[in-house]
């Protein structure tokens, strides 16, 4: 099911992190453009979501903005509208996947596990999780 979310037509660079339409060297930008195959579960003008290739839960989907921005902090400063669109997409995907609950995670920086420097929200569900996360 595709859901169109309100978009922000022109988003200025806030000067925090790298931001451009797409980055030809970025793995996620290549997935957005269809240059690299992925199991895409959701797409609209602001967001593309696809299954993680090394899932950490029965449902593990990566939700990425369709503009290249390095991390969650930069995305939030650049566009609260697109940031909200990622969370709205997470809710729609969870509903489609039949999840009664889910965890959403942004890793911001290499020291906490960010390995692709294109902001992305992890949607994890289908099993129990502990707190604090390990």
Annotate each language-model stretch with its function.
Residues 4-6, 10-134:
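HIT superfamily nucleotide-processing domains
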């Amino acid at each position: 099911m595709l859901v169109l979310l309100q978009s922000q037509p022109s988003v200025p660079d806030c000067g925090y992190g790298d931001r451009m339409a797409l980055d030809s060297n970025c793995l996620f930008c290549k997935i957005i453009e269809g240059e690299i195959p992925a199991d895409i579960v959701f797409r609209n003008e602001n967001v593309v979501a696809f299954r993680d290739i090394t899932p950490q839960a029965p449902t593990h989907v990566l939700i990425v903005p369709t503009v290249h921005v390095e991390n969650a902090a930069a995305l939030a400063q650049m566009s609260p509208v697109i940031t909200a669109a990622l969370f709205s997409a997470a809710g729609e995907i969870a509903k489609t996947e039949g999840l009664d609950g889910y965890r959403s995670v942004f890793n911001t920086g290499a020291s906490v596990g960010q390995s692709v420097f294109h902001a992305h929200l992890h949607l994890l569900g289908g099993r129990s999780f502990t707190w604090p996360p390990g």
